[in-house]
């Protein structure tokens, strides 16, 4: 009887461990030495694009670099954007068809928080959004400065997207209530803005 119980315990532990592992996606390290266009060229070429190729996904290396650009940890141990009083209290979530993921910058990984496909909550009356393979949601608990921090992050992503031939746009026409629920935000946290990313159609 004891052997049966022990075997069942081990099996449950292993299954639980596999489930936990499946909920974490380790990201490749960003390539910080790749040659990219000069900053002034990127600023000059930056634009918002509202047409996405739904059949062309974003690879893991590019995903990692997008997230690092938005709110990663730099060589000083700080973030890639400045935050007032070094609060660093912004959160970045990734929405994909396979669920909702939280970007853990310190461990350079995505952590799944839900199997739900929340992309429809970002589309509202703009159907083109559904074609983007990657969606970033910026959230914060700072009503006064959170929008500033998100603006710095999505501008970084704009410039990276321009350098890599990606399409992106900033949007505020989303279902804030449903996203708040789906992202499992605390009462003092709120959704700031949505940034779909992909390749232009």
Where are these regions (language model features)?
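Solvent-exposed loop/turn segments at secondary-structure junctions
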Residues: 72-74, 99-100, 142-144, 176, ...
């Amino acid at each position: 009887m004891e052997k049966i119980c022990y075997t069942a315990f081990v099996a449950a532990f292993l299954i639980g461990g596999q489930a936990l592992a499946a909920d974490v996606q380790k990201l490749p390290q960003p390539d910080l030495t790749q040659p990219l266009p000069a900053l002034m060229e990127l600023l000059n070429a930056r634009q918002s694009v509202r047409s996405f190729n739904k059949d062309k996904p974003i690879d893991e290396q590019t995903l990692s670099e997008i997230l690092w650009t938005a709110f990663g940890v730099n060589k000083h141990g700080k973030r890639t954007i400045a935050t007032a009083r070094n609060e660093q209290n912004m959160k970045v979530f990734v929405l994909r068809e396979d669920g909702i993921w939280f970007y853990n910058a310190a461990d350079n990984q995505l952590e799944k928080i839900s199997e739900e496909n929340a992309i429809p909550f970002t589309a509202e009356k703009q159907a083109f959004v559904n074609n983007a393979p990657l969606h970033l949601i910026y959230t914060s608990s700072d009503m006064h400065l959170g929008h500033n921090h998100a603006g710095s992050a999505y501008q970084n992503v704009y410039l990276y997207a321009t350098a890599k031939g990606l399409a992106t746009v900033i949007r505020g026409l989303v279902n804030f209530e449903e996203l708040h629920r789906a992202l499992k935000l605390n009462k003092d946290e709120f959704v700031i803005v949505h940034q779909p990313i992909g390749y232009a159609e």
